Amino acid sequence: MYIIAHRGASGYAPENTIAAFDLAVKMNADMIELDVQLTKDRQIVVIHDDRVDRTTNGSGFVKDFTLEELQKLDAGSWYGPAFQGERIPTLEAVLKRYHKKIGLLIELKGHPSQVGIEEEVGQLLGQFSFSINNIVQSFQFRSVQRFRELYPSIPTAVITRPNFGMLSRNQMKAFRSFANYVNIKHTRLNRLMIGSINKNGLNIFAWTVNNQKTAAKLQAMGVDGIVTDYPDFIIKDGKHENI
């Protein structure tokens, strides 16, 4: 089972920053989940929201900034003074820093401004084909499908919305044609659904789990990965995965 650090160890450090990613590595996470978008000058940056307002000292849409402009913003002070000066990283910088240390679960954001992001991310990942483990995912099923068509050797995942119900056999068959994993909100999962998904040839990630008892229950039910803000408190193989 994969322990997947949600935007890094974001329970302890500002999300989607090198500080959060370094901490995830120290906490022995198996993967880092992160979000990518394209800048005005078509550079791939790691940030969740379509605007910079919540997680930086700037204001405006990511798509309206060049990379140089974005990297002048402070992406850490909003979380705490200890993280002042953290910057929005590029996906390339993240791959260079971590490709031999930890896997990446890369979410393609589905904003209208992100046309062509599948090609951009796939080309970059091709330069790091010797990485430990990379998986590309999205809430936008067409984006995952497009990525699979372009880069069939790179594993993919579909993320389902919180209100997504029980997957039908036809839905699972459709997903299986372009994805290896289904990433489902943990409150929607039960033993019956997990068994059904596995029987239909898909692996399962559960997002976002920040309760130890819930994590243990999901592990016992057979999920293949747990996405969490606190990768150090997940119990794996009978042991805490601590620093």
UniProtKB/Swiss-Prot annotation:
What is the catalytic activity of this protein? a sn-glycero-3-phosphodiester + H2O = an alcohol + sn-glycerol 3-phosphate + H(+)
The residues the record assigns to binding Ca(2+) are 33, 35, 107
Which coenzyme or cofactor does it need?
Ca(2+)
**Domain GP-PDE spans what residues?**
1-238
Please give the PROSITE patterns that the UniProt record associates with this protein. Answer: GP_PDE
- One biological process GO term for this chain? glycerol metabolic process
Query: Superkingdom, according to UniProt?
Result: Bacteria
Q: What is its EC number?
A: 3.1.4.46
Task: State the Gene Ontology terms under molecular function.
Answer: glycerophosphodiester phosphodiesterase activity; metal ion binding
Asked whether the UniProt record includes Metal-binding among its keywords, one would answer yes
How the cofactor binds, per note? Binds 1 Ca(2+) ion per subunit.
Q: Which PANTHER family match?
A: GLYCEROPHOSPHODIESTER PHOSPHODIESTERASE, CYTOPLASMIC, GLYCEROPHOSPHORYL DIESTER PHOSPHODIESTERASE
Give the protein's biological function.
Glycerophosphodiester phosphodiesterase hydrolyzes glycerophosphodiesters into glycerol-3-phosphate (G3P) and the corresponding alcohol.
Instruction: Report the sequence similarity comment from the record.
Output: Belongs to the glycerophosphoryl diester phosphodiesterase family.
What name goes with this protein?
Putative glycerophosphodiester phosphodiesterase YhdW
Report the source organism.
Bacillus subtilis (strain 168)
